[in-house]
Regions:
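Flexible coil/turn and secondary-structure edge motifs
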Residues: 2-226
């Protein structure tokens, strides 16, 4: 069981960075196939693992792997990887809010990533692998703030990865709660990755991913999460 430190204040966990650059971002509320949908942008290591998970979530209409918050238009993947453009590998999650809410999406996100490391997910390291939640609608900030505070309060967690199925239920011996390294900020821009990069794990199932997709399949974890 998770224990709250006496007197611990959930407030002040999340510092939002409010930018004004929106020229590359369309309005979050849109329609796809006649259905009103919303978008949320999630980063958690290599985008192909995150995309594979969220593409299987009921209520998610579409996922697109790409790069978020680049300092230059249409960044090349090699420039993202070497840190030249300050972008992060990210997945655009388009969902039907009548079938799934942002809270469920964030619960899935915090289950499959390690939010306590900075630019490290499994064996993958680099600033482009940092974890992040990027929003385009201010109405999402209360939910994001709540979940950030909640997982900060829960302590040091392990992700579903490295063939180790642990649902963010771990505290170290000293009960130390490291700060969450996940950034939560307004989306500045998003550029889709090349087509060959979309649904990469389905094309190349042997590719290493910090998120153990096979274990998720074998245990039916996605059904549990949704």
């Amino acid at each position: 069981m998770w224990r709250k430190t006496p007197g611990e204040d959930l407030g002040g966990i999340l510092h939002f960075y409010h930018e004004i650059r929106h020229e590359f971002v369309r309005n979050e509320d849109s329609r796809k196939g006649g259905i009103a949908v919303k978008d949320l942008y999630l980063a958690g290591g290599p985008y192909y693992g995150v995309q594979e998970v969220f593409s299987r979530i009921k209520g998610v209409v579409e996922t697109t792997a790409g790069f978020a918050n680049s300092s230059v238009p249409n960044p090349r993947k090699e420039d993202v990887e070497n840190g030249k453009v300050q972008a992060v590998e990210c997945v655009k999650v388009t969902y039907n809010p009548k079938k799934i809410d942002i809270g469920t999406l964030l619960s899935v996100f915090f289950t499959i990533v390690n939010p306590y490391t900075d630019g490290i997910q499994g064996k993958c390291t680099g600033p482009h692998y940092r974890t992040g939640i990027y929003y385009v609608s201010g109405e999402d900030t209360p939910q994001i703030t709540y979940y950030m505070a909640y997982y900060q309060n829960r302590g040091n967690s392990r992700p579903v990865s490295e063939s180790c199925l642990v649902f963010n239920e771990y505290e170290n011996e000293k009960n130390i709660r490291p700060p969450i390294r996940t950034e939560a900020r307004r989306l500045e821009n998003f550029y889709a990755a090349p087509e060959e990069e979309q649904y990469f794990l389905r094309k190349y199932p042997g590719t290493y991913s910090p998120i153990d997709i096979k274990l998720l399949e074998e245990t039916g974890t996605l059904e549990i999460l949704t």
